[in-house]
């Protein structure tokens, strides 16, 4: 005879790893060329001046400068404004 009842198995208890999405460089922050500005799924934020978009919709700086967030045609847009070396 069984000493204990059979321990049932649970079908829950799993979760996916977080993807660490979001803004990585905020407005007025200085970034160097190639720096990631926003990690996202889809184009929640669109690339503006001096900003490129990667295959996974990541936005990155094409030049050294300061990050500027704004709106254009009803969309959120991020640009990088070149800054003269101090």
Swiss-Prot record:
Gene3D superfamilies: 2.40.50.100. The keyword Hydrolase does not apply. The gene is rpmA. One of its GO terms (biological process) is translation. This is Large ribosomal subunit protein bL27. It comes from Rubrobacter xylanophilus (strain DSM 9941 / JCM 11954 / NBRC 16129 / PRD-1). Residues 1-21 are annotated as: Disordered. SUPFAM superfamilies: Ribosomal L27 protein-like (SSF110324). GO terms for molecular function: structural constituent of ribosome. GO terms for cellular component: cytosolic large ribosomal subunit. Keywords: Ribonucleoprotein, Ribosomal protein.
């Amino acid at each position: 005879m069984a000493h204990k009842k059979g321990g049932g198995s649970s079908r829950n208890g799993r979760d996916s790893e977080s993807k660490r999405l979001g803004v990585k460089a905020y407005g007025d922050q200085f970034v160097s060329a190639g720096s990631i500005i926003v990690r996202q799924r889809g184009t929640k934020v669109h690339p503006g001046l001096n900003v490129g978009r990667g295959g996974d919709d990541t936005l990155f700086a094409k030049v050294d400068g300061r990050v500027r967030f704004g709106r254009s045609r009803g969309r959120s847009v991020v640009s990088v404004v070149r800054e003269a070396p101090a």
